[in-house]
Design a protein with these regions (language model features):
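Single, function-defining residue in the core of a domain
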Residues: 1-8, 46-47, 58, 71, ...
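Nucleic-acid substrate recognition interfaces
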Residues: 2, 18, 37
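Short, basic interhelical loop/turn and adjoining N-cap
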Residues: 16-30
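Active-site-proximal, Lys/Arg-enriched surface segment
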Residues: 27-86, 90-92, 97
Length: 347
C-alpha cells in the first residue's frame, strides 16, 4: 500500500507485486482475500492497537466524527487521537450501513465509546472532542457518569442555556460584545436543563458562526477550550488524507462492498499512517524537513504524515549520504515497536 499510495484493492495489489516481485494478478487476489478474511477480527486488533497508539500518555484528547461513503451506502464513526503534529491518528472506528443510522446512531456511538474505554490502559484520562452533530445531553451523561470521560462538544446556537444565577438565553446570545468569549460555570443546557461543567460562547472575527461549547470541566479557561476544540479539525484533515483521490489515498472513490471489508481497509490505512508518520518523524529529527519546503521558516510546514509521504517518494533516488541516516533513524524507531512506549508518543 505504501508503494501504491492508494487504498484501491487493485492498486494495493500492484504495489505489493512491485515491492515483492510477485505476479500482479496473484498479488491483487491476496489483497482481496485479506479484506474478506473473517479470521481478522477488527475488535481484537483494536484492543491491541489502541494501547500502542496511546503509548506513555497519561491523558488523551480524542476527536469523534462520522464520515460517509454515499456511493456504497456506508458511514464510518471514527475516534482519532489529537496530536501536536497536524494530523489526528486513527484510534478506533466502526463502519455501518447508512440506512441503519436513523434509528441506531446513538447505539453505534455508545458501542464505539465503550470499546474505546475497554481498550484503554487503566488510569488514562480521556476528553472527547466533537462537533455539533454530537451535542446531546444524553451523550454528556454517558460520557461523564458511565464512562468517566471528559468532553468538549459544540452544540447549536439556538439551544437554551441557563446561567448559574438563573438567567436564560439562547447559546448564541451569550456571546460577549464584539464576539468575545464568555464562560458560564455550572450552566444548564437544553429545555431539560441538564447541568454541565461549563459553557463557552465565542465568535472570533474569523468564525462564520459562534462556537457554543459544552464541557465537563469547571476550571478550563476560554483559551484552553478554544484551542482544544480548534484541534478537532485535524480529524477532517485525516479524512482527506484517506478519502481524497488527489491529495490522499482515495478511499472515497473506490467501491467497498461491506462495512466489514471497509473496517479492514481502515486498519491497513491506520498502519500506513503510522509508518509514514514515523518516517516523517525520523526525517524531521535529522533536519530533512528543510529539504521538503520552499520557505525558510523554522516552524513545521508539513505534517509528519505528509513529510513521510514525500520522503517515501524520494527514497528510490535519494543519495546514500541522506538515505542511510534516514533508514537508520527509522529502523531505530521500528525497533521500539514491540514495546511501543516511546515510538507512539510521536504518533
Amino acid at each position: 500500500m505504501l508503494s501504491s499510495g492508494s487504498l484501491a484493492v487493485s492498486t494495493i495489489g500492484h504495489g505489493l507485486a512491485l515491492a515483492r516481485g510477485l505476479t500482479t494478478k496473484h498479488a491483487i487476489k491476496q489483497v482481496d482475500r485479506l479484506l474478506s478474511n473473517e479470521g481478522i477480527d477488527i475488535d481484537a486488533a483494536l484492543r491491541h492497537w489502541v494501547p500502542y497508539v496511546v503509548g506513555p500518555r497519561t491523558s488523551i484528547n480524542v476527536a469523534m466524527d462520522w464520515t460517509e461513503f454515499d456511493a456504497d451506502g456506508q458511514a464510518t464513526l471514527m475516534l482519532s487521537l489529537l496530536t501536536r503534529h497536524g494530523r489526528a491518528t486513527p484510534l478506533l472506528w466502526l463502519t455501518v450501513d447508512t440506512a441503519t443510522l436513523k434509528n441506531c446512531r446513538n447505539e453505534y456511538e455508545y458501542q464505539a465509546l465503550v470499546r474505546l474505554a475497554d481498550a484503554l490502559p487503566a488510569d488514562i484520562k480521556v476528553c472527547i472532542v466533537a462537533d455539533r452533530g454530537f451535542g446531546d445531553h444524553k451523550l454528556y451523561h454517558v460520557l461523564t457518569e458511565e464512562l468517566k470521560f471528559d468532553y468538549v462538544i459544540r452544540f447549536r446556537g439556538n439551544i437554551q442555556v441557563t446561567a448559574a444565577d438563573g438567567e436564560m438565553r439562547t447559546a448564541a446570545a451569550w456571546v460577549g460584545r464584539g464576539g468575545r468569549a464568555r464562560v458560564l460555570r455550572d450552566a444548564l443546557v437544553t429545555a431539560e436543563r441538564y447541568q454541565v461543567g461549563s459553557v463557552l460562547c465565542v465568535q472570533d472575527k474569523a468564525m462564520k458562526q459562534a462556537w457554543c461549547l459544552a464541557t465537563s470541566s469547571t476550571q478550563a479557561s476560554a483559551k484552553t477550550l478554544i484551542c482544544l476544540y480548534g484541534k478537532r479539525w485535524s480529524i477532517e484533515c485525516g479524512f482527506r488524507d484517506t478519502k481524497d483521490l488527489r491529495f490522499g489515498m482515495g478511499m472515497g472513490s473506490i467501491h467497498v462492498s461491506t462495512p466489514t471489508r471497509r473496517d479492514r481497509l481502515w486498519l491497513l490505512n491506520a498502519f500506513a499512517i503510522m509508518l509514514l508518520t514515523l518516517l516523517g518523524a525520523a526525517g524531521e529529527a535529522l533536519g530533512y524537513d528543510r529539504y521538503l519546503k520552499s520557505n525558510t521558516t523554522k516552524r513545521r510546514t508539513h505534517s509528519l504524515f505528509r513529510q513521510g509521504c514525500m520522503l517515501y517518494d524520494l527514497i528510490p533516488n535519494m543519495p546514500d549520504g541522506r538515505l542511510l541516516p534516514l533508514i537508520e533513524r527509522f529502523a531505530a524507531m521500528l525497533a521500539e515497536l514491540p514495546v511501543f512506549a516511546d515510538t507512539f508518543g510521536v504518533v
